[in-house]
Amino acid sequence: ALREQKSKADLAAMVSKANYRLLLAQDDNSVVGFSIVFVAGSESFCLLEYMAVDKSHRGGGVGSELFEQTIGAVHRSNVAIPILLEVDSDREPSPDQVQRRRRQNFYRRLGCRRIAGCTYILPLPGENAPPEMDLFVYVPGLAPTIRRGELEGWLKLIYRDVYGCSADDRRIAIMLDGVSDPIDLA
């Protein structure tokens, strides 16, 4: 969705911060993709904020390789910490429904799992409702469940450190309202 896209200036400011990692995918010295990852100060998890591959290079393994490189960059200094992903839901009627489904399937093929029962609320500026999102998680050898308290901690840090919202933002309670404990990964 266009509302969730950041400007070039916002992206540049983001990657200049110590808790962000930027990775580039190149082909013949041309950038054909990139990923930006936020690593929590506690290094207990990270958030894949952006991952994009040029349309002309999709379907050729560039995205899969970029994801693997991103995992390697995060896990190089940390032991297999969870990587969270904010992914457009494929359950919401949308003109880009096919693309949403492909994106979800892409991340599933790479080993990511959706956090069941959590309809993620992206804290976007403005009055309009944000697009319906799912929260995915990736950890090699991850158990089929996570604890509700763990998810709550991740959400509070994301809202505070990534989006500049209060860790007590009411939207966090709304997201947690539909999840069980332990939470299944779909």
Model-derived features with residue positions:
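A conserved beta-strand-loop-helix scaffold within acyl/acetyltransferase catalytic domains
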Residues: 1-57
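Terminal substrate-recognition subdomain of acyl/acetyltransferases
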Residues: 75-186
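Short, well-structured alpha-helical interface segments that form or flank functional binding sites
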Residues: 43, 61, 65, 98-102
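Conserved acetyl-CoA-binding loop-helix of GNAT-fold acetyltransferases
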Residues: 53, 59-76
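Glycine-centered flexibility sites
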Residues: 33, 61-63, 111
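Long, contiguous hydrophobic alpha-helical segments, chiefly transmembrane helices and signal peptides
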Residues: 48-53, 66, 106-107
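Short amphipathic alpha-helical segments and helix-helix/interface helices
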Residues: 11-12, 71, 104
